[in-house]
Amino acid sequence: MDGEDIPDFSSLKEETAYWKELSLKYKQSFQEARDELVEFQEGSRELEAELEAQLVQAEQRNRDLQADNQRLKYEVEALKEKLEHQYAQSYKQVSVLEDDLSQTRAIKEQLHKYVRELEQANDDLERAKRATIVSLEDFEQRLNQAIERNAFLESELDEKESLLVSVQRLKDEARDLRQELAVRERQQEVTRKSAPSSPTLDCEKMDSAVQASLSLPATPVGKGTENTFPSPKAIPNGFGTSPLTPSARISALNIVGDLLRKVGALESKLAACRNFAKDQASRKSYISGNVNCGVLNGNGTKFSRSGHTSFFDKGAVNGFDPAPPPPGLGSSRPSSAPGMLPLSV
């Protein structure tokens, strides 16, 4: 009743019925609790009787174990006396056998020493063999990597040479476009001053110049295709006689500026690749003239490997890792930076 809210009653009969129902509910709960208590008491008495029976059995088993323990102690004493007697007899026999054993041990030590020397020599030979095999595999792997890297660099150099041609052609085309734009602007100014009533013809001339700049390719063409660019004079106006808007003219000029920026980026990248190729060539000549050492075994025996170390660096042969290649020039093909022309031609 502490947590329940007492409702409001409209009549005395409703209040009486409510309290009567509540009392019946509490009476039923009390009856259930009393039944559970009686059941719990009966279970407790049964458990207590069972535990008492187990206690009696445990005490009986403990007494039996104590009796067995006492009997085993007597047997141990008898066995100790018998063991001492046997030990005295065996000691005499052991003293006689030890003399024979000392002689056989001396012979055995000599044989063991000889066997250890043979095993050590065998281990040294096997270790030298494994080191030789591992070194040979490492040398072959590095040789293959060097060959692949050199082939890749040679292909890159070929691409750079073709890019030089394309870059020079782009420069020439851009220079021609700038000159032609300047000439046409001057012609347009002269025409505007001489004939101010004909703006449509001037617009058409400017549109043809802008269309010529729009027709230039943004990247060099690939190998096997003719690396030629159409002359601005030979490019037709794709819009017919309709003039271009000022935004189209600005876009065309922006394209020309982008071409010039890309050409400059290609020149800087080509210079870096040339410097790296020169470094690789000098490094290869230094390695081929200095690396010719072999692998030493455990006894100091030298195995000459001059025929396998001529293509590897001196640090790898002496047990040190070679210097890593410069960033961006690993086994995978480097990607072009954003806003630059691709290297493939």
UniProtKB/Swiss-Prot annotation:
Changing T219V: Abrogates mitotic phosphorylation. Residues 329-339 have a biased composition (Low complexity). Pfam families: NUDE_C. Residues 315-345 are annotated as: Disordered. The keyword Transport applies. Residues 189-256 are annotated as: Interaction with YWHAE. It is found in: Cytoplasm, Cytoskeleton; Cytoplasm, Cytoskeleton, Microtubule organizing center, Centrosome; Chromosome, Centromere, Kinetochore; Cytoplasm, Cytoskeleton, Spindle. Keywords: Centromere, Chromosome, Coiled coil, Cytoplasm, Cytoskeleton, Developmental protein, Differentiation, Kinetochore, Lipoprotein, Microtubule, Neurogenesis, Palmitate, Phosphoprotein, Transport. Residues 28-190 form a coiled coil. Expressed in brain, heart, kidney, liver, lung, pancreas, placenta and skeletal muscle. GO terms for cellular component: axon cytoplasm; axon hillock; cell leading edge; centrosome; cytosol; kinesin complex; kinetochore; microtubule. Residues 191-345 are annotated as: Interaction with NEFL. Interacts with PLEKHM1 (via N- and C-terminus). Interacts with YWHAE. Interacts directly with NEFL and indirectly with NEFH. Interacts with microtubules. Self-associates. Interacts with DISC1, dynein, dynactin, tubulin gamma, KATNA1, KATNB1, PAFAH1B1, PCM1 and PCNT. Interacts (via C-terminus) with CENPF. Interacts with ZNF365. Interacts with GTP-bound RAB9A; the interaction may lead to RAB9A-dynein motor tethering. Belongs to the nudE family. This is Nuclear distribution protein nudE-like 1. The gene is NDEL1.
